[in-house]
Amino acid sequence: MTVFTPLVLVCAGGTGGHLFPAQSLAYALKARGIRVALATDARVDSIAGDFPAEEIVTIASATPSGRSMLRRAGAVLTLGRGFGQAARAVRRLNPAAVVGFGGYPTVPPMLAAQLLRVPTILHEQNAVMGRANGFLAKGAQVIATGFKEVRGVPEKATARRIHTGNPIRPSVLAVAETPYPALDEGSPLRLLVFGGSQGARVMSEIVPAAIEKLPQDLRARLHLVQQARPEDLTATQNRYLAMGLGGIEAAPFFKDLPGRMAAAHLVVARSGASTVSELAAIGRPAILVPLPGALDQDQAANAATLAQIGAALSIPQSAFTPDRLAAELVDLFEAPRKLTQAAAAAKTARILDAADRLATLVAETAAATS
């Protein structure tokens, strides 16, 4: 006798910011005996190996933005081709529900599911709803949010909004209860610097110049771990080697980033939704530099959720100078109580069972519309 087990199609853009929470949901669904397939774009190759999907469907995708009408028209044509691919995949997989985590690669499969009357659930990770999710929200049965307050949700969809939190990766949950590292006069100062899943050149430009400005006694205690883009790596390492730091490790990518976050006294980073949620989960203070230039300013809104409770400093990139960063580092490292208080404040914003909450929502939505 064949036992039917439902399948959920999870859709996410191919970068860590979208894939990490999608991955966390996938693990939670599989723990309930629900099969998972993933629809995404070609960028997924570098991080797809850890995704617990029985099938990965690559969908043609593009972002219809910019001033060039030709480029925008080309993007629309690409999305149209992706819609055809997605519609065939949805018919073949016959999912009980389709869950979208944002980014334009989610538009073709989510729209295909809505037109084929398959229940859809949106998850918005940021404190400002993205344009792709805003477009899809009208046809979704449920809109789950990572933050309690989210700007930009279409008015007609607000009644279907449920705050679940952002799903946290198992590797983060594994270190979430790590106590804040002891910090006293003369002890090592552990600073972690990273720029998100794709790195950030500004960190390689500003942070070394700021470290040079620190008093020598602080530099001697500083143990620095920094993510640097491959093209910046050698120059960044060489600058640090001349500073007399207590320790330095730089690399383009750290697979064990959650463990390094748990070991840090302070984190300097961008403020993507996953980063902000993981800082809260582990309880680590941060200096956050929101990605500039975004029309919706979503990273600034994300950073504000921690800054408003005293868990982080949010510095616009235009004000993120070596002098400003050096001054903030001296202020925090010379007053350890500020760091421990910020660490405790960060934990007040965490939702460790967000993946289970979202999995329950997905299962209930699929059952209610089957």
Curated annotation (Swiss-Prot):
Keywords: Cell cycle, Cell division, Cell inner membrane, Cell membrane, Cell shape, Cell wall biogenesis/degradation, Glycosyltransferase, Membrane, Peptidoglycan synthesis, Transferase. Signal peptide: none annotated. Its main location: membrane. GO terms for cellular component: plasma membrane. It comes from the Bacteria. Its EC number is 2.4.1.227. It is found in: Cell inner membrane. UDP-N-acetyl-alpha-D-glucosamine binds at residues 15-17, 126, 169, 197, 299. It holds the Pfam family Glyco_tran_28_C. One of its GO terms (molecular function) is undecaprenyldiphospho-muramoylpentapeptide beta-N-acetylglucosaminyltransferase activity. It catalyses: di-trans,octa-cis-undecaprenyl diphospho-N-acetyl-alpha-D-muramoyl-L-alanyl-D-glutamyl-meso-2,6-diaminopimeloyl-D-alanyl-D-alanine + UDP-N-acetyl-alpha-D-glucosamine = di-trans,octa-cis-undecaprenyl diphospho-[N-acetyl-alpha-D-glucosaminyl-(1->4)]-N-acetyl-alpha-D-muramoyl-L-alanyl-D-glutamyl-meso-2,6-diaminopimeloyl-D-alanyl-D-alanine + UDP + H(+). It is a peripheral membrane protein. Cell wall formation. Catalyzes the transfer of a GlcNAc subunit on undecaprenyl-pyrophosphoryl-MurNAc-pentapeptide (lipid intermediate I) to form undecaprenyl-pyrophosphoryl-MurNAc-(pentapeptide)GlcNAc (lipid intermediate II). HAMAP family: MurG. This is UDP-N-acetylglucosamine--N-acetylmuramyl-(pentapeptide) pyrophosphoryl-undecaprenol N-acetylglucosamine transferase.
